[in-house]
């Protein structure tokens, strides 16, 4: 008798279609998307995705734009860091 394999995750809905690498990428993206994200306004881990690039905190109802699958993109982090560095140089 066949033994039951492990859980397939969110990409298990595709079955054997689309290839292993594509299904794995979808599973990674969806797991990151559904993690707890901190609100940039209040700091609570209650941010939910409303649509493509639209995120909303369910605690303070702060709505903001971000990446399609993450509230903050790597490029956005870089820009924020460079703005902070420029502001700290002006203060000195």
Curated annotation (Swiss-Prot):
GO molecular function: large ribosomal subunit rRNA binding; structural constituent of ribosome; zinc ion binding
Cofactors named for this entry: Zn(2+)
Keywords from the named record: Metal-binding, Ribonucleoprotein, Ribosomal protein, RNA-binding, rRNA-binding, Zinc, Zinc-finger
InterPro entries in the record: Ribosomal_eL37/eL43, Ribosomal_eL43, Ribosomal_protein_eL43, Ribosomal_zn-bd
Binding, Zn(2+): 39, 42, 57, 60
Swiss-Prot/TrEMBL GO biological process terms: translation
UniProt family annotation: Belongs to the eukaryotic ribosomal protein eL43 family. Putative zinc-binding subfamily.
Name the record gives this protein: Large ribosomal subunit protein eL43
Gene coding for it: rpl37ae
